[in-house]
Amino acid sequence: MSRFLNNKLRRYGMRAMLSLVLSALGIAAGSSNEVAADASVKASIETSKGVIELNLYSDKAPLTVANFVNLVERGYYNGLVFHRVIPDFMIQGGCPDGRGTGGPGYTFADEFDSSLKHDAPGILSMANAGPRTNGSQFFITHVPTPWLDGKHTVFGRVTKGQSVVDAIKGNDKINKITLSGDTAGV
């Protein structure tokens, strides 16, 4: 695992443990189908079909958001394509070889929060090949996909541009991804 992710894991490890303990004691807020994203970090995906705006859940999936922010800041996603598009399911991008088999050269663990579900269109989640295989690939849903809960880390939600998500076809381009908000705190 990269030094960047190790530092983030150490930084958020205590927070995650505290959250787990509070949840076990029933002190944390109850779950809801409408989870408010931490609006302090936002992403904007400029595609060949238009712009998709997202809020990221840096408070509930800190390692995943930190990884995504790091890759965006390095320009990793710029020029890649949505290599896997399944109508009435999802669009997937983030593979450097455009075939769904590549990644950034490392993997990291899943982050599951019981309040984050694949319960609506526009859920931003990590694509993976099984437990602990997250890297750079992500997907955005067209419809609710509850069978993915507990298998793929949810780390954001579309706030504007779901029609763009729905218009994306295979090999449509990610021109660039930009961030706004407090990315220094991620």
Report the location of each language-model feature.
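Cyclophilin-like peptidyl-prolyl cis-trans isomerases
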Residues: S2-R11, R15-V186
